[in-house]
Amino acid sequence: QPDDKISDLSKDVNLLTTFLAHREVDLESLKRGNPVDCILICASSVLNQASQLFHAMESRPPLARTLVLVGGIGHSTSLIYDAVARHPEYSTIHAKITGLPEAQVLREILNRFYSLPGVEAGGPRVLVEDQSTNCGANAVKTRNVLDEAGITRIRTCIVIQDPTMSLRTKASFEKAFEDLPQLQRPRFMACPIVVPVVHAVNGQLEYVLDSAADLRAEDLWEMKRFGELLVGEVTRLKDDENGYGPKGKGFIGHVDVPM
């Protein structure tokens, strides 16, 4: 039955999304838990993640001692400009952010629409890494930014990234700090704020939307693009000659990808 096939497909997509998102901590437990040393947010066209994080930090500034906004200009930066243009609030700064590195777009959003207290008033130190052009460089250059700021003893570090790339990004950060003695390495935890769920509706895949998180279908990927991202990501994670692991390009450590 075609409907059964779509229903099976939705289960497969959700399984894959859950694996790639690799959520180890969610925003609610982050809000309630002890402050962490560092939160890294990698810019993504899913702006809802930044919105929810900035809102949480506005209501509880000591959430993290350091906040790093991450992302230069890469192959999908234009999608972030498009997402800003479509956004009901942020669209007012579209002209100003067009052409900026991704991390600077996040900084504009943070400064214009949210108010965090300064470090002296208990707020986080905000750093910007705006030179990287891919996931591996995000990690290496973020470490440089932290080192230059004198932030070298990080115990707990939350990584917020596009849910389709969350597992790989965490692996990239672990790789970037692997030269440190085991006890001095940060403990990285993946915290994708938005993890899409799909279901079958009239023979089509559609997103299950979370009204509490203020998430709209247009905030997410077109479904075909979403599928392509998921499949491409699995290829990168596999530790073989085509992947990004030790047996391939060596950008990340070994990741077990279930068959």
Q: What annotation goes with each model-predicted range?
A:
Residues 1-211:
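A structural signal for short, hydrophobic/glycine-enriched beta-strand patches
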